């Protein structure tokens, strides 16, 4: 990650440096909280992975966010310390590769979740009868493999990680990334709009929303918090001009995007008046829409937060 710090004694620059340091410090703290939240979500989702196919998606999303936040925290340390600590080029490139890889994986998984949930809501009979048993597992595996391939191609063409870079191929690949980012965003917007219309106008509008609401909130979270980081990547590699403050702002919003998802899961699944007093496992099940198992689970909820096992 190239340092964009400007060292000068002018008052305006001193103000910018103070602002940037504040944003980066908040980013570190938020990333630390996100690591804890995603770690808990990852552990709980692993207990529930065979009960709900959508939990497989969220398990992969939590894994991608966990890796992203780890790399994100480490990568901004030189910026936070005003370049008093510099990583070797190998570490710098590796952190860049991993962050971009996890970002694209998370975006692709979110598009897959919104698409499958839209199909399940619009065509429930077809979805239950025709859906392949291992569809979710295959889609997740395909996303990880294809995103890894794209990341390796970009690393080989745009850096010296695997040898001499090819700048012409690098520009072409980043144009492909721009098209991919636009296509995934359009997919999420269209499927989320259809899902919202179905939820608000369908016969089930007075029933508990559960997972469809979670998907809608996750898409909104990406559009407002995750998308700026993608724009930063494109502007950096396609020579678009962006203000310096947007550079650090996109870092902060990327941390918000990855750290806020576990909070959405638990607040959406918690019962008003019982928040922070229910077992986290039951809260997550409710957010996933596993209402069938919650009847017996409500009795167990008297055990408190420590009851987190299946």
Swiss-Prot record:
Compartment(s) of residence: Cell membrane
| Stretches that traverse the bilayer | 23-43, 61-81, 93-113, 134-154, 175-195, 214-234, 249-269
Membrane-protein topology: Multi-pass membrane protein
Q: Which Pfam families match?
A: 7tm_1
Gene3D superfamilies hit by this protein: Rhodopsin 7-helix transmembrane proteins (1.20.1070.10)
Checking PROSITE patterns in the record gives: G_PROTEIN_RECEP_F1_2
Q: Which residues lie toward the Extracellular compartment?
A: 1-22, 82-92, 155-174, 235-248
Q: List the GO molecular function terms.
A: G protein-coupled receptor activity
- Tell me the InterPro entries matching this sequence: GPCR_Rhodpsn, GPCR_Rhodpsn_7TM, MRGPCRE, MRGPCRFAMILY
Q: What is this protein identified as? A: Mas-related G-protein coupled receptor member E
Organism lineage:
Eukaryota, Metazoa, Chordata, Craniata, Vertebrata
